Amino acid sequence: IVSRVEDATRVAAAIERLSVEQSTVIRLSFIEERPHSEIAAVLGLPLGTVKSRIRLAMNRLRDLLDDAT
């Protein structure tokens, strides 16, 4: 259980280091579990832009988490 809490803390800290655009789509997609089409509608963005931001944000998160270990 401690490891899960530590992992969640690391991920939350990494999300805070993302750009506002990236952290917003990550929160909406993975924390609020909204579909990409809904995120696009809420943010007033094309679906492709939302998918691209999620992909880029995930890549950045991986880099941040790899650097932290």
What are these regions (language model features)?
Residues 2, 40-41:
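Short coil/turn segments at secondary-structure junctions
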Residues 25-29:
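A short pre-motif secondary-structure segment
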Residues 1-16:
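Acidic, proline/glycine-rich intrinsically disordered inter-domain spacer in sigma factors
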Residues 3-4, 18, 35, 60:
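Exposed, low-complexity/repetitive linear segments and helix-based recognition motifs
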Residues 31, 37, 43-68:
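DNA-recognition helix of helix-turn-helix
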Residues 21-22:
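The N-cap/first-turn positions of alpha helices
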Residues 17-18, 46:
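Histidine kinase transmitter module recognition
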